[in-house]
Amino acid sequence: MTAHIAPATVPPSAPAAAGQDPAALLAHARREVLEAGRGLDEAGVLAVLRLPDEYLGDALALAHEVRMRWCGPEVEVEGIISLKTGGCPEDCHFCSQSGKFDSPVRSAWLDVPSLVEAARQTAATGATEFCIVAAVRGPDARLMSQVREGVAAIRAAVDINVACSLGMLTQDQVDELTAIGVHRYNHNLETSRSHFPKVVTTHSWEERWETCEMVRAAGMELCCGAILGVGESLEQRAELAAQLAVLEPDEVPLNFLNPRPGTPFGDYPPVQPRDALRAIAAFRLALPRTILRYSGGREITLGDLEAQGMLGGINAVIVGNYLTTLGRPAESDLKMLADLSMPIKSLQATL
C-alpha cells in the first residue's frame, strides 16, 4: 500500500505571518477556529507556540472555548495495560522498553485473566476505553493469538471499549483487529517527519503513517499522537500538529518526555510547564474536533498545573499508571474532573 504522506511544511497564511501581534493572532484564531471550526495552519500553530507568557492565559481560555464548542463538555477516561513489556527491537530513543538500551525494564508477558481483571478495574473508574499495549515492532502470530483471546475475554466480561497498540500492522492484521471488535487503534507519529530520524532509526515515519492510514480505512477509530520534549524545535512541533491535522485522527494523545534511565534521552530536561501549556493550546487550535488526551509525562511536566491544561483544550485523560512509569492515582484525576465540574463521557456516547 502506498502511503499518502503529509507535506513536511504547510505554506503560511497571511493572518498567521511571523511577527504578528499576539492580540491579532488570537482574534484571528477566534474567528477561524472557534467560530468557523477551521483549525489553525502550521504558521498559526507556530505563532501560538511563540506567544509571550502574558498571552498564555488568553490562549488557554480560547482553546477551552474551542473544545467546549466543537467537542462538548464531557471528558473521556481511558486505562492502559501492557500485554508484552520490554525487549522491543526498535530504538525509539525516549523508550525504556527498547531492547537496544541498558534500561532496567525487562521483557515480560501478561496472561489473559490478568488482562480481564485490569479491564474490570479500569471500568470501575468510569473509564470507557481500555487499551492493550505491546512493546513490539509489529505483532507476530503469538501476539495476535494472545490479543484475540484477550479481546474476546474482555468483551465477554466487561462493559468497556477495547483498544490496541501493537506497533506497525499489515493489512491482514488490520482486518483481523477490526473483525474481532477492536474499537480504536493507537499508533503515534511521535514527532514531526523532519525530526523523526533523530528519534528513531530502526523504522521510518512513513511506515507509521501507512499503518495509520490502513487503520482509518478499515473503520477503526484512530488514536495518533505525539511525545514532546525529544529535541524538537518549536517549528517541528508546529509541523507535527499540521501533519496530524492532515491525518485527522479521532484522538491525539499528548505525551511529554519523562526521561528514562539508560535511554539516549535519559538526561534530557522535561518540557517547561508554560511551554507544555502553550503546546496544549496550540494543538487544540489546530485540531478543534479531535479528542485531545493527557498522556504520559504530564505529572512530571505540569505538576500542580494539570488543571490548567484541562481548562486549555484537553478533553480526555489516561488514568492510573502508564506502561513503565507511574501516573497519578485514578481517584486524583477523577477528583480533578469533579472539582472542575467536567462530566465523564458515558460508554454509550463513545459508540
UniProtKB/Swiss-Prot annotation:
One of its GO terms (molecular function) is biotin synthase activity. It catalyses: (4R,5S)-dethiobiotin + (sulfur carrier)-SH + 2 reduced [2Fe-2S]-[ferredoxin] + 2 S-adenosyl-L-methionine = (sulfur carrier)-H + biotin + 2 5'-deoxyadenosine + 2 L-methionine + 2 oxidized [2Fe-2S]-[ferredoxin]. Pathway: Cofactor biosynthesis; biotin biosynthesis; biotin from 7,8-diaminononanoate: step 2/2. Binds 1 [4Fe-4S] cluster. The cluster is coordinated with 3 cysteines and an exchangeable S-adenosyl-L-methionine. Binds 1 [2Fe-2S] cluster. The cluster is coordinated with 3 cysteines and 1 arginine. PROSITE patterns: RADICAL_SAM. Coiled coil: none annotated. It comes from the Bacteria. The keyword Metal-binding applies. [4Fe-4S] cluster binds at residues 88, 92, 95. One of its GO terms (biological process) is biotin biosynthetic process. CDD domains: Radical_SAM. HAMAP family: BioB (MF_01694). Belongs to the radical SAM superfamily. Biotin synthase family. Catalyzes the conversion of dethiobiotin (DTB) to biotin by the insertion of a sulfur atom into dethiobiotin via a radical-based mechanism. NCBIfam families: bioB. Homodimer. This is Biotin synthase. It comes from Frankia alni (strain DSM 45986 / CECT 9034 / ACN14a).
